[in-house]
Amino acid sequence: MKSQLLSLAVAVTTISQGVVGQEPFGWPFKPMVTQDDLQNKIKLKDIMAGVEKLQSFSDAHPEKNRVFGGNGHKDTVEWIYNEIKATGYYDVKKQEQVHLWSHAEAAVSANGKELKASAMSYSPPASKIMAELVVAKNNGCNATDYPENTQGKIVLVERGVCSFGEKSSQAGDAKAAGAIVYNNVPGSLAGTLGGLDKRHVPTAGLSQEDGKNLATLIASGKVDVTMNVISLFENRTTWNVIAETKGGDHNNVVMLGAHSDSVDAGPGINDNGSGSIGIMTVAKALTNFKLNNAVRFAWWTAEEFGLLGSTFYVNSLDDRELHKVKLYLNFDMIGSPNFANQIYDGDGSAYNMTGPAGSAEIEYLFEKFFDDQGIPHQPTAFTGRSDYSAFIKRNVPAGGLFTGAEVVKTPEQVKLFGGEAGVAYDKNYHGKGDTVANINKGAIFLNTRAIAYAIAEYARSLKGFPTRPKTGKRDVNPQYSKMPGGGCGHHTVFM
């Protein structure tokens, strides 16, 4: 008997030693995660405390924002890193990278009347260009869309079909002096050219109303435009924060992410403090449980400048490492004040834009979350305008949630979700008014619980989930840019 007890003691010691260093303290004694238990750990007070903390980082600096590489974002990154590290449940790292920051301002007048314009980030500067305005056909995505007399003139282009950067490049190839892109949905237009390019010309954005008025004026006579663009550029060091559970199968990784940066204009509390805090709240709640599959959380940098942080991360993984990631969930703007509950259309049934195999199952899981509670929801398209894009391009199944940005809510949607028709989902989108006061508490709480629901499901088991597609390269979808406004589900505006 003594020898048997000694053998048992040795076995227990060996098992315990095997757990230490691989799994967090107390792991064997934690209950297995379930959907109900993890959701019950989500508290609105914790979520709101988190978004208030992000607001404080913006308020603490003269810039009043959390743009990547700036002080407000540095504070954000350090806080996220330290909060998650302190749990002891995760292996946490900061992934350093350098990206080009750009800030631009524009002044545009037509026939002496000043218009409300915004410069595209990464636009070349322009000092008082004075030229006649001409109109590009279609959406200015092809050389044949530009009039023969474009050289030396400023060209007016409607948003849609291709990126702002491509429009600017095509205008440059046509030897235009500048380009003005106007919105194809109500509201003003601010965006990015996606990076520096010698083909680009000075480029500004206008509202749909102002753009259409200019097109009407040109049809009846000559329009002279004066255009000024001030552009600043700076290489900035910045970081992704990546945290993976110490426990669970690291060859079957469930991954989720949200971008942690804002635009220059404001603190970015809905866009995307809501997603950042949503996944942080779930990350902290998850520490109460054990799981079967490892879960990897990511807080992406520089999303607002062209999905730079997530793209950098995905490109840093070889096919073998990326194949361990069985799916990716994206959460970008989940607390919009005039919200709609939107789920990425993984099966393509609404927009004919399917994600990689497994994306449909992700969509169905979120649908079940809402359906089981009798809560309305609607699909939103994979447009390539948020951080899932780099994953889809490498054939990783993707999905997630979104409560709306600049698109205007319809009367039909009001019947489903409440709110106000004729008003954007987020009227403070990309503006200084995107503060804590901009958050819809009901929306952010519900969507954070939905995140917990999905993570609990996949952390327990991937049974029934399609075999992970072979890692490869693919387009997000050749039709993605044809969505109204460049996307009714994603908001990094480079198209």
Curated annotation (Swiss-Prot):
**Site (Transition state stabilizer) residue list:** Y429
Provide the cofactor note recorded for this chain's UniProt entry. Answer: Binds 2 Zn(2+) ions per subunit.
User: What Enzyme Commission number(s) appear in the record?
Assistant: 3.4.11.-
Name the glycosylated positions. N142, N235, N272, N352
Indicate where this protein resides in the cell: Secreted
Which residues does the UniProt record annotate as the domain PA? 130-216
List GO molecular-function terms, semicolon-separated. Answer: aminopeptidase activity; metal ion binding; metalloexopeptidase activity
GO terms in the biological process aspect are: proteolysis
The entry's active site is E303
Entry binding sites for Zn(2+) 2:
D271, E304, H430
What is the annotated quaternary arrangement, including any partners? Monomer.
Descriptive protein name: Probable leucine aminopeptidase 2
